[in-house]
């Protein structure tokens, strides 16, 4: 059975709740087992992903996953912090995804305000958590179609 790791940034709990609910619903519908790793904010997502990959490389079977989903949110504020954190988060996730041939769905929101975040995280609305899970599942299928192991 396939197994996926959801790495979730909980900086905005009420937004993270919606993203996680959407992702979990998609994996449950697909019959895919999923674990959860929680980090403080989106800046920590790439580091957490790299730690999991390192643990798997060092033989930790509990750290072996067929796919990954990253979830979190950055909301623009009064300073440039949002831009720097969002850029580094996305770069780090993309770099690891390509370097390790990961089946990964990215559900990190970078939005201008809370209303945008709520609309995108709500499973009954834009459901970006669910979209990230579906992207992960599709990339897992692509790897299988190409004969690549997890």
UniProtKB/Swiss-Prot annotation:
Annotated positions binding 5-amino-6-(D-ribitylamino)uracil: 11, 42-44, 73-75, 106
Pathway this chain belongs to: Cofactor biosynthesis; riboflavin biosynthesis; riboflavin from 2-hydroxy-3-oxobutyl phosphate and 5-amino-6-(D-ribitylamino)uracil: step 1/2
Reaction it catalyzes: (2S)-2-hydroxy-3-oxobutyl phosphate + 5-amino-6-(D-ribitylamino)uracil = 6,7-dimethyl-8-(1-D-ribityl)lumazine + phosphate + 2 H2O + H(+)
Biological processes per GO annotation: riboflavin biosynthetic process
UniProt protein name: 6,7-dimethyl-8-ribityllumazine synthase
InterPro entries reported in the protein's UniProt record: LS, LS/RS, LS/RS_sf
GO molecular function, a single term: 6,7-dimethyl-8-ribityllumazine synthase activity
Claim: Transferase is one of the keywords in the record: yes
Chain residues that bind (2S)-2-hydroxy-3-oxobutyl phosphate: 78-79, 120
Pfam families xref list: DMRL_synthase (PF00885)
Domain of life: Bacteria
Species for this entry: Paramagnetospirillum magneticum (strain ATCC 700264 / AMB-1) (Magnetospirillum magneticum)
Family from the record: Belongs to the DMRL synthase family.
Matching NCBIfam families: lumazine-synth (TIGR00114)
Catalytic activity, EC: 2.5.1.78
Function: Catalyzes the formation of 6,7-dimethyl-8-ribityllumazine by condensation of 5-amino-6-(D-ribitylamino)uracil with 3,4-dihydroxy-2-butanone 4-phosphate. This is the penultimate step in the biosynthesis of riboflavin.
Active site: 81
HAMAP family: Lumazine_synth
Keywords from the UniProt entry: Riboflavin biosynthesis, Transferase
